[in-house]
């Protein structure tokens, strides 16, 4: 965009200088110092000026000069950023060569690369439009994959990089009819008059210009800060984002939050709930929120295991975390070895249906009873690893006495659990006997250390029981460990490339993983906010409506970090008055979602802006809507399945380490802009554009990220831009591969896992000696819980069976006799690929078309359906006291009577009447789930403890 201005470049003492006049697309220049330059760039001396203005300058030197003020830039912020962008482009000229990136496929077609939550892909473009997307098939230049030798056979994955069905639907997501293409203002919102907050979610919108939208947003930010003080601004995004280290919310949004001083969201560990609030107290692993290490477990499982127990585990649906279908071939290898496979899940999930084996279907929320009964059999029949229990654990005797009934007079026998779970005692006894006599891997959750069962009312006790069972079997010895072939491949992790959770260009070393490596490799100005207020995500409605809320932090550093209450508002801070919401997912992913609809309509919140790609979910509640482009329409860079941070080395789910530039494949649709550009535009209006952007464009940040990694050692920037990806050779020699997870602990050696955690201060006698607990041992009796609250009945110091407060034994069961479970969906990454008019809607297991409308399926047993007069694909109302959702009934034997199943994360909020007060037909199952936390002293989700009733839907009449 052409601008008219005068730029002065000079030595600070005015001894030398040259100014440049830009006018109507032309530039002229003269020696000397201009008396009225619009932008002045002043250097301490000529030597520094020459050093920093040369081609391919040192970014470290440039940043350092800014930090010590030997380089200053003064002028209007928008012009300063414009000049900095221009000069960066000039001094990095070798990185820019027109449109010569991507691969020419002939006939006017270019092949680009990009990434997604469903995997990386090729993007074929012609005439500025996407033709198709495909998975990345490797070429002859790419290295061979790894081979594992096990039981006289060789196992080698194919030479391709997989992509999920929802990953490959991105073309239809880019061109979705629900795309937001222009800035919008609610028709009855007047920032200088009546704001009509009661009409949020009801009123329509009118198109406005970007200048008007940005002026309103920036002026509201300034007004609210001045009027109400620190803490009055609040920014909230979702757990996930479009792929890429630069555009990801922990990068671009995080720096924006710090630059302007927003209150932050206090996240709950939604994928790990039970392992974080319960499991970690037995063994630490706080950096992974209580979930286990899985280094080299794929090879160990193929070589040594005899049995696999998958408990609340469906990796064929959830892909671990971004792992797409990479683990499917490895589970195929396992099947070919005739290893016994057991599935424990109320729903006969997709992994069970594909892999086969024995299926156990406990009633929701009763899994812990089944686990304790298994422990009872092991104790009474001596089917456990006594060496491990005696030498690597502490407190077993107390737990053993509880199992045997010495504490409460109730032996936890298979017969006892049958009354709770509905599973015959003989079957549980047979399972326990076989498990206790075989070298067995166990996968609690699809990636191990997650799972739907940990997101129930007693999810912490379930997670604890999983760890206690594995401790009884001696985890870490050959063939006994955690995993289901989803994690733990022999890839080379000694090659540095950061995951998105390491913060991108955020410069934030408090709330990202940047301090581990990236802050040393990619120089930037520090990004720290002075605001210390947090709003608990699960209590946002209460914070808005009632003015106060309580949360507990998600702290990866210590066991005790989660014990500190985090009250809202913080001392000396204002209540939230301005809500900057990224995306629309909370209406579907957070429990008792109607609360969020009602919270938007309070006049306690004076201004709401939503920045989103699609018009869905809670976007409709904003005063101003800012349209965002997809990552197909901007530059970025990333690695397949690599999040980093609290899921360290996530790429070990993959069969190839795959790094890719995310080309700007097409121009942004309509007037949509990238998050980075929107944030920069707002910051410029508020005078902090330079601190936010450091004078870089997104392309500049991508190049800086490339330079910060090990990629320049193996591929040139030019070739990387052209080919689009690089495959790192795996570790071919078995002796060079990582030691198997926890083998060091089983054998009593120093920890040899390739990770820096836990922190040195967490070790008790010697660095890398023992676990993170007080004793350094696996603790059946948890010292941390004993110190914190030894008498807490919801979280006792030993693992116990605590019946669900919303289950068959609760009073509510008489009114709502169906137990609803809502695991993560198979065909969408949470809300990201659902709705939007995409091709995913045509998959009948995802949505069902009835009279031209795509309804969310609810699965019900034939016996329950017959009692209610429900037939296959009838429209039904799923309801309880929190609300109701209209779904399409799927009558199936894949769950037992009394249990119903519907995935969470429908993206489309479509109330039939007033928002928050009427049935929804978009499929927002979380309208029905409880907002109560698992235990009171936590900030935890219990969505899978949910009682409902179902009846036929007849429009505005139900029966």
Model feature map: region roles:
Residues 1-96:
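Feature captures hydrophobic
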Residues 13, 21-26, 124-130, 881:
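Short acidic-glycine loop/turn motifs at beta-strand connectors
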Residues 95-383, 424, 466, 506-522, ...:
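N-terminal export/assembly segments and adjacent metallocofactor-ligating motifs
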Residues 97, 153-155, 161-162, 166, ...:
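Long, contiguous, secondary-structure-rich segments that constitute the structural scaffold
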Residues 168-212, 216, 230, 244, ...:
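N-terminal leader/propeptide and maturation segments of large enzyme subunits in energy/redox metabolism
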Residues 238, 391-393, 434-435, 448-451, ...:
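A glycine-rich phosphate-binding loop feature that marks nucleotide/adenosyl-phosphate handling sites
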Residues 249-339, 343-344, 369, 467-620, ...:
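Extended redox/cofactor-interaction regions of prokaryotic respiratory oxidoreductases
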Residues 355-361, 629, 636-646, 658-668:
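Short beta-alpha connecting loops at secondary-structure transitions
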């Amino acid at each position: 965009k052409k601008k008219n201005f005068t730029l002065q470049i000079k030595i600070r003492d005015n001894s030398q200088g040259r100014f440049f006049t830009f006018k109507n697309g032309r530039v002229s220049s003269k020696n000397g110092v201009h008396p009225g330059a619009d932008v002045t760039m002043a250097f301490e001396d000529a030597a520094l000026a020459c050093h920093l203005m040369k081609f391919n300058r040192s970014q470290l030197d440039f940043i350092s000069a800014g930090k010590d003020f030997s380089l200053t830039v003064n002028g209007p912020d928008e012009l300063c950023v414009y000049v900095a962008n221009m000069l960066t482009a000039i001094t990095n000229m070798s990185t820019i060569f027109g449109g010569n990136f991507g691969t020419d496929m002939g006939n006017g077609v270019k092949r680009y690369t990009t990434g997604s939550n469903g995997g990386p892909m090729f993007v074929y473009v012609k005439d500025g439009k996407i033709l198709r997307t495909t998975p990345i098939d490797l070429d002859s230049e790419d290295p061979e994959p790894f081979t594992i030798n096990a039981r006289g056979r060789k196992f080698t994955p194919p030479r391709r990089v997989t992509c999920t069905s929802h990953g490959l639907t991105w073309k239809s997501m880019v061109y979705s009819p629900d795309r937001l293409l222009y800035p919008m203002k609610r028709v009855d919102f007047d920032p200088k008059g009546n704001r009509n907050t009661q009409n949020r979610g009801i009123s329509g919108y009118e198109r406005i210009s970007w200048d008007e939208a940005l002026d309103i947003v920036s002026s509201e930010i300034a007004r609210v800060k001045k009027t109400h003080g620190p803490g009055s601004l609040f920014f909230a995004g979702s757990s996930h984002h479009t792929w890429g280290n630069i555009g990801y919310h922990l990068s671009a949004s995080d720096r924006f939050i710090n630059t302007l001083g927003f209150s932050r969201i206090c996240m709950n560990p939604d994928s790990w709930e039970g392992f974080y609030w319960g499991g970690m107290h037995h063994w630490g692993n706080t950096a992974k929120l209580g979930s286990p290490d899985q280094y080299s477990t794929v090879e160990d499982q193929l070589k040594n295991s005899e049995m696999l127990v998958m408990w609340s585990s469906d990796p064929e649906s959830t892909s671990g975390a971004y792992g797409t279908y990479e683990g499917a071939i490895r589970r195929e290898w396992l099947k070919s070895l005739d290893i016994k496979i057991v599935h424990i899940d109320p729903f006969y999930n997709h992994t069970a249906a594909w892999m086969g084996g024995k299926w156990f279907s406990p009633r929701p929320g009763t899994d812990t009873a089944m686990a304790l009964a298994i422990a009872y059999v092991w104790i009474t029949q001596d089917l456990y690893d006594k060496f491990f229990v005696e030498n690597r654990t502490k407190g077993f005797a107390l737990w053993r006495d509880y199992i045997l009934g010495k504490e409460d007079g109730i032996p936890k026998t298979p017969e006892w659990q049958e009354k709770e779970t509905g599973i015959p005692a003989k079957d549980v006894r047979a399972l326990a006997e076989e498990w206790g006599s075989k070298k067995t891997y166990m996968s609690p959750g699809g990636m191990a250390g997650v799972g739907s069962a940990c997101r129930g009312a007693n999810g912490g006790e379930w997670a604890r029981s999983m760890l206690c069972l594995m401790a009884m079997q001696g985890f870490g010895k050959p063939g006994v460990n955690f995993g289901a072939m989803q994690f733990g491949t022999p890839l080379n992790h000694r090659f540095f490339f950061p995951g998105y959770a390491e913060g991108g260009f955020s410069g934030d070393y408090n709330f990202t993983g940047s301090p581990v490596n990236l802050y040393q490799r990619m120089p930037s100005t520090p990004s720290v906010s002075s605001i210390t207020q947090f709003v608990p995500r699960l209590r946002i409605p209460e914070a808005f409506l009632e003015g106060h809320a309580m949360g507990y932090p998600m702290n990866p550093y210590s066991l005790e970090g989660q014990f500190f209450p985090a009250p809202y508002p913080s001392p000396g801070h204002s209540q939230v008055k301005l809500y900057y919401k990224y995306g629309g997912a909370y209406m579907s992913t957070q429990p008792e979602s109607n609360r969020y609809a009602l919270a938007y309509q309070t006049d306690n919140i004076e201004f709401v802006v939503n920045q989103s790609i699609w018009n869905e979910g809670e976007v409709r509640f904003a005063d101003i809507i800012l349209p965002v482009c997809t990552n197909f329409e901007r530059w970025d860079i990333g690695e397949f399945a690599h999040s980093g941070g609290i899921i360290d080395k996530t790429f070990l789910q993959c069969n190839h380490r795959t790094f890719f530039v995310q080309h700007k494949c097409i121009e942004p649709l309509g007037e949509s802009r990238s998050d980075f550009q929107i944030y920069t535009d707002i910051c410029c209006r508020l005078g902090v554009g330079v601190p936010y952007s450091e004078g870089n464009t997104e392309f500049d940040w991508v190049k800086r990220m490339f330079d910060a990694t090990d990629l320049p050692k193996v591929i040139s920037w030019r070739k990387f831009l052209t080919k689009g990806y690089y495959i790192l050779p795996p570790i071919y020699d078995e002796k060079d591969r990582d030691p198997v997870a926890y083998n060091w602990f089983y054998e009593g050696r120093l920890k040899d896992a390739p990770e820096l955690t836990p922190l040195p201060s967490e070790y008790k006698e010697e660095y890398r000696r023992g676990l993170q607990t007080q004793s350094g041992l696996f603790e059946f009796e948890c010292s941390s819980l004993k110190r914190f609250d030894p008498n807490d009945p919801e979280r006792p110091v030993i693992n116990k069976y605590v019946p669900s407060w919303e289950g068959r034994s609760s009073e509510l069961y008489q009114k709502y006799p169906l137990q609803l479970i809502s695991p993560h969906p198979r065909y969408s990454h949470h809300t990201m690929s659902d709705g939007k008019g995409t091709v995913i809607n045509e998959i009948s297991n995802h949505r069902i078309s009835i009279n031209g409308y795509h309804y969310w399926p609810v699965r019900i047993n034939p016996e329950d359906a017959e009692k209610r007069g429900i037939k296959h694909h009838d429209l039904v109302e799923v309801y309880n006291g929190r609300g109701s959702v209209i779904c399409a009934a799927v009558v199936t034997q894949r769950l037992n009577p009394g249990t119903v199943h519907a995935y969470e994360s429908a993206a489309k909020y479509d109330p039939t009447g007033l928002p928050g007060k009427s049935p929804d037909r978009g499929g927002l199952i979380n309208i029905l789930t409880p907002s109560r936390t698992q235990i009171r002293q936590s900030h935890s989700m219990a969505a899978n403890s949910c009682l409902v009733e179902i009846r036929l839907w007849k429009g505005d009449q139900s029966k």
